[in-house]
Amino acid sequence: MNVHESHPRRDRDLENITLEALTVPWRLQFRVDEALYAVNPNGWTCYIEERDQRCLRVTNNCVISLLKSDLKRRYQTCTLNIGIRVAVPQNYVVILAKLTDPDPTSRGIPIIQVANGLIDSGYRGSIRAVLFFEKSCIIPKNGLAIRLSLVKLASPNLNTRVLFNLSDITPHLECGPDFSTSIETAVRLGSGETKPLLPPSGGGIWAGTGCRALACLYNDRVCKASHYTSSDKNIAFVVRYNDSTSVLGLKDFPTAEDETFVRFYTSGQFATLIPFFETFTPKRTEDAAYDIAAPGDIRLGALSSTTIMIQQRYVCMDDSVIPCIFGRSSMNLRGLIIIPSRWLPNSWLTITICNLTEMTVMIRCGDRIAQLLLVDHESATLIPPTNDTTGMFPTVGKCRRPGASVGEPKWRETLEFDTEAYSSERQFSGFGSTGI
């Protein structure tokens, strides 16, 4: 083939293009997804860490004075503008944490606590850290170091549900005995038929289940499956009773016109016991995390803490998703700290709230108290490796070199942030993951 010869068909096509069409300007729009940052040199120094280019280290290059205005309070809270603006792709989040200082007192550095924070991909304002300190103090030059880690988010199918054994979940449910009794009764009344069953008591709800009807599936292949999906939102749960029988919980009694299709299969992917969005609030595209609402009223005494359990659990056998719990910036400013932690598989969702104020605090049912972050396994080295529920303000140490990764974005500094950073819906509103 002679590459220098004109293709006859192409020549004929070109002849059909009119002169007017050739004069129409061609408009090409494009965007490059990058991890951009801009730094205000007046007060702060920022550089990319050599061991892991997903990490930015920010240090103060001038003295910072912190004044405790309320001497009656044990902890003073304030926000500190660290002079950095970032723009990252929508499938990433920036996690803010203080770097560990092995011996701060020998260098005359006061003990300052920094709340972990999440910065959404759509936020374009200056990043602010929430600080806690017990007395007025002066932070010397280079006395405060903060890391901004570029963390990849996971995108699992959130409609996937998991089958759990009745014996595994009943001991942990608040309604355990009633739930178990209802399932056993339904299996006995089902008599080998798959049909919706009303509670024998006639009370309208099967005790402990929140369901108006239960249906038994007498099929050993279903019982061998691990996951299921269904577009029918009437399905509250599917529980494996034994090796040959599973029970579906139906929120309302189905009518003759209703058709329910359930796909059962075996997988190692992320799946929840209860519908995901019955526990977590849907988020915008630019948001990193899913809000978690208080399951009931919570009363927190002064300088106290409490741990609450939310009836939701998950499995992820392939370890592709690492669910993490973080606090909210608005809660931090009120002196209410959510201890950052990993949500462990096959465990109920537990959240520890600490009240660092001298006042009793009431949290109402439905108030947003925490956030769920679904982290991709490739970013596992950038989050706490264990489920430490004792440290309110986790710090990060020396970077560990990541394994070989292809296509991971790296930080790039820009002097034209407003021009190069792609537009976002949120822009400058609030700070943290969901704003104040």
UniProtKB/Swiss-Prot annotation:
Transmembrane segments: none annotated. Substrate binds at residues 328-330, 431-432. Keywords: Hydrolase, Magnesium, Metal-binding, Nucleotide metabolism. The keyword Signal does not apply. It catalyses: dUTP + H2O = dUMP + diphosphate + H(+). One of its GO terms (molecular function) is metal ion binding. Disulfide bonds: none annotated. InterPro entries: dUTPase-like, dUTPase-like_sf, HSV_DUT. Its EC number is 3.6.1.23. One of its GO terms (biological process) is dUTP metabolic process. It comes from the Viruses. Its cofactor is Mg(2+). It is an enzyme of class 3 (hydrolase). Belongs to the dUTPase family. Involved in nucleotide metabolism: produces dUMP, the immediate precursor of thymidine nucleotides and decreases the intracellular concentration of dUTP to avoid uracil incorporation into viral DNA. This is Deoxyuridine 5'-triphosphate nucleotidohydrolase. The gene is DUT.
